[in-house]
Design a protein with these regions (language model features):
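Class I S-adenosyl-L-methionine
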Residues: 1-116, 129-139
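Short, Lys/Arg-enriched alpha-helical microdomains
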Residues: 124
Length: 139
């Protein structure tokens, strides 16, 4: 059981106001579902917030090909400045020019005007795999 606001964030979908880094991070290793709302009146003394029961089913091998650190960094970067496009956030993180950032997104079939909150779970997986291949595998 968690606060209602946390439950909304954990279980939200891309394109919604509640979708953020916590949602995308959980999606890498689990699936979540809101089971039950619990109003504040069910407690004594009543708290100032409502609660919800969330079911999280972990599957740490959901995406075995994904480097979890690079995925987390990709997600964190995408939501670093919500008002900025993904291109601008990637430019700052990877120290690349605008064209290279746009090419990176195009390679992943992601709109160059996209923001972090519009990316699906599979978009984040694809983007993190491409970033790893292009920036972190040249050792």
């Amino acid at each position: 059981m968690v606060q209602d606001e946390v439950a909304r964030r954990i279980c939200s979908r891309e394109g919604t106001a509640d979708y953020g880094a916590i949602t995308a991070s959980i999606n890498l290793v689990a699936s979540s579902e809101r089971i039950l709302s619990v109003p504040r009146t069910m407690f004594f003394p009543a708290p100032n917030v409502d609660s919800a029961v969330v079911k999280i089913i972990f599957d740490r091998d959901k995406y075995p090909e994904v480097d979890k650190k690079i995925y987390r960094d990709t997600v964190r970067t995408a939501f670093l400045s919500r008002r900025k496009t993904l291109v601008n956030n990637l430019r700052e993180w990877l120290k690349i020019d605008k064209q290279r950032a746009e090419d990176l997104l195009t390679k992943c079939n992601i709109d160059i005007l996209a923001r972090g909150e519009t990316l699906s779970e599979s978009d984040f997986v694809t983007l993190s795999l491409v970033i790893k291949a292009e920036f972190f595998s040249k050792i």
